[in-house]
Amino acid sequence: MRIGILGGTFDPIHYGHIRPAIEVKHALALDKILLMPNHIPPHKQQPNLTTAQRLKMVADVCSQLDGFELCDIEAKRDTPSYTVVTLEQLKSLHPEDELFFIMGMDSFIQLKSWYEWQRLFDFAHLVVCQRPGWQLDAAHPMQQILTARSHAHQETHEGHAKNTHKNSGQIFPVTITPQDISSTQIREQLAKGEIPVDLLMPVTLDYIQNQQLYLP
């Protein structure tokens, strides 16, 4: 099975998370996508909602989307959500499956600052989402890694038959439709009493309104 993994604070989860995940799922013929809320994001301030509230919102979204499932292993952890620890745990749960960890190009270019980043490739492929026409500068230090581990590059140099059995360690660049949406923007709108109906799935908006979340 080919399993995509999209982690995030999801505070709240919105179409800027969901639409790229759907596009990646189709582009790489993934069997399912795991949406994985963080508990203690190492690179972010603490979230506005409780872990339980964010889990509920993501679970609601997954119930509306075919092939999407909530993954709560980071949310249940009491230590920081380092990706390499999570992927190692997921790989132990899915030893025969291919894992595809989804990130934006903005995260990829910072990858060397991640905890034990080289070991990510031991457990999963990386999917790097990029805007149409955008390319990493040839002189950027991450370009060499992107080129060497590119799925297309390895198929060209190793041959398709050999490559199909590689179930981790590759990078799959995927061009996605730009989504000019941020959780900060949504929280600010809600705090002002505005209803961002175009940015949130109805099930998410219903939960936020019923629970009176993000009010000033």
From Swiss-Prot:
GO biological process: NAD biosynthetic process
Transmembrane annotation, as ranges: none
Residue pairs linked by disulfide bridges in the UniProt entry: none
EC number from the UniProt entry: 2.7.7.18
GO molecular function, one term: ATP binding
Broadest EC class assigned to this enzyme: transferase
Entries under Gene3D superfamilies matching the protein: HUPs
Keywords tagged on the record: ATP-binding, NAD, Nucleotide-binding, Nucleotidyltransferase, Pyridine nucleotide biosynthesis, Transferase
Keyword Methyltransferase: no
Catalytic activity line of the entry: nicotinate beta-D-ribonucleotide + ATP + H(+) = deamido-NAD(+) + diphosphate
Taxonomic superkingdom: Bacteria
Family the UniProt entry places it in: Belongs to the NadD family.
Annotated function: Catalyzes the reversible adenylation of nicotinate mononucleotide (NaMN) to nicotinic acid adenine dinucleotide (NaAD).
Official protein name in the record: Probable nicotinate-nucleotide adenylyltransferase
Gene designation: nadD
